[in-house]
Amino acid sequence: MSKLDRWRGQIPDAELATYAKGMFAHPVGLGRYPALLNIDTTYMFVDPAYPQCGGPTDDFQAALVAITDVFRKLDLPIYYSRRDDRAQPVRRGLWNEKLAIPATGAFIDSYAHDPRADEWPPSYGPRPQDCVILKNKPSCFFGTPLESFLRYQGVDSLVVVGVATSGCIRAAVVDAFSHNFRVVVPEEAVSDRSAAAHWANLFDIDMKYADVKPMREVIKMLGKFSVG
């Protein structure tokens, strides 16, 4: 099945034809040494107790556990990103205005000083050997040493998981593509507050920047990498 065929029924045929004409949708696959990039799956964004959470389900978290276990068994690098919880306004930049209470202008972050908000569930969270990237903007490449770390380790491709598909996932995928990393996105292991935004962005990512595949296919792709 071609990339275009898998979207039939969700995307009108006339629109798919324009992508075919433009020669989009070619697969990129994985390179010689992939890493897992887990974006923003801290309690703040996966636990309904936090107002910033929206979209993640038990199936989503099970998918995170599954792909993390595969990378650990293969001894492949795992990277995590989360917000920089240091609360200086200058670090937040325009988030101060975009996420503000209109009447007062106060920044909306009732969990700024809640350490648990920035921790991960232990079932898929980081271990001492993993690298955690702190970020202030949607892309974990922007203003961080992530690219330098990946190059040092010889990483040439990424499996990207996390939240939210239309925001930080998309931003990271586009930046990874811009840095010439091959990217694969397991569709069950990304989530969004909006189903419409989720699927629209997965389609666009699949057409232009990466490969969006079911988890079973991603795990099969990783089968060529052996321990050691």
Predicted regions located by residue number:
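Active-site loop/turn elements of alpha/beta-hydrolase fold enzymes
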Residues: 41, 83, 188
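Acidic-leg catalytic submotif of subtilisin-like serine proteases
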Residues: 35-45
